[in-house]
Amino acid sequence: MQNQLVVKRLGRRDYLPVWQAMHEFTDTRNEETPDEVWLVEHNPVFTQGQAGKAEHLLNTGDIPVVQSDRGGQVTYHGPGQLVAYFLINLRRKKLGVRDLVTTIENLVINTLKAYNIDSAARPDAPGVYVEGRKICSLGLRIRKGCSFHGLALNVNMDLSPFLRINPCGYQGMEMVQVSELGGPTDIALVEQQLVKELVNLLGYEQVEFSTEAEVREA
C-alpha cells in the first residue's frame, strides 16, 4: 500500500462534516490503508487553527467561524478555492513533519510553474507566495504517524472575506489567486496538475480516482 494513492473529489461541502470524516478516517486507518487525498471546495467559513487568536478575527459578519485542530492561525475557505487534504501515513513514506510541509509547498510551487507563475515558500510563514502575496495557505495535524488537514490554494474566488481577518495571523497580508496571474479559472484543471505533482514528488505508482459521495455528513 506504500505506493498506492486514492484521490477523492468531494465537490462543494460544508467544512465541519469533512473535518469529522477526516478524523474518522485517521482514527480507523491501519498499516494496510492506502493514503488518500481529498479535493474539495468549501462553503464560506473562517477556520481557526490551534494557535488562533481572537484578535485576528476583525469583522467576520455572517460568515461562520469554526475552531479547527490544524496547525496555524485563522484563514478563510470559500467557493473557487481548491482545498486538498492529505491523509498520508508518514511512517510508511519515511517522512517527517517538516518533510511533508516542504513537499506540499513544492507541489504547489511546481503546479503554479506549469502556468508560468513564479512562487516561493517563506521560512517564517508556511504557505506559498507570489511576490509577497499569499496564494496558498497550509495547516496540518499528525496523529498516529499519519497526517490530515492540508492546503488551500486560491484559484478563482472572491478574496474580499480575507479582509475581515488577519490571514494566518499577519496583519495586512495581501492575498492573490491563480486566475489573476494568468492561470486557469477552472479548479478541475488545477486539481489535475496538483495531483500529478504530488504523485511525482512522493512516488505513488498506483493512483485511483473517485467522486466520493459517501463521506458521511455526521
From Swiss-Prot:
It catalyses: octanoyl-[ACP] + L-lysyl-[protein] = N(6)-octanoyl-L-lysyl-[protein] + holo-[ACP] + H(+). Residues 31-206 form the BPL/LPL catalytic domain. Pathway: Protein modification; protein lipoylation via endogenous pathway; protein N(6)-(lipoyl)lysine from octanoyl-[acyl-carrier-protein]: step 1/2. Substrate binds at residues 70-77, 137-139, 150-152. Keywords: Acyltransferase, Cytoplasm, Transferase. The record marks 134 as: Lowers pKa of active site Cys. It comes from the Bacteria. It is found in: Cytoplasm. The active site is at residue 168. Its EC number is 2.3.1.181. One of its GO terms (biological process) is protein modification process. GO terms for molecular function: lipoyl(octanoyl) transferase activity. The keyword Zinc-finger does not apply. It is an enzyme of class 2 (transferase). InterPro entries: aa-tRNA-synth_II/BPL/LPL, BPL_LPL_catalytic, Octanoyltransferase, Octanoyltransferase_CS. The keyword Transit peptide does not apply. One of its GO terms (cellular component) is cytoplasm. Belongs to the LipB family. In the reaction, the free carboxyl group of octanoic acid is attached via an amide linkage to the epsilon-amino group of a specific lysine residue of lipoyl domains of lipoate-dependent enzymes. PANTHER family: LIPOYLTRANSFERASE 2, MITOCHONDRIAL-RELATED, OCTANOYLTRANSFERASE. Catalyzes the transfer of endogenously produced octanoic acid from octanoyl-acyl-carrier-protein onto the lipoyl domains of lipoate-dependent enzymes. Lipoyl-ACP can also act as a substrate although octanoyl-ACP is likely to be the physiological substrate. This is Octanoyltransferase. It comes from Vibrio vulnificus (strain YJ016). The lineage of its organism: Bacteria, Pseudomonadati, Pseudomonadota, Gammaproteobacteria, Vibrionales.
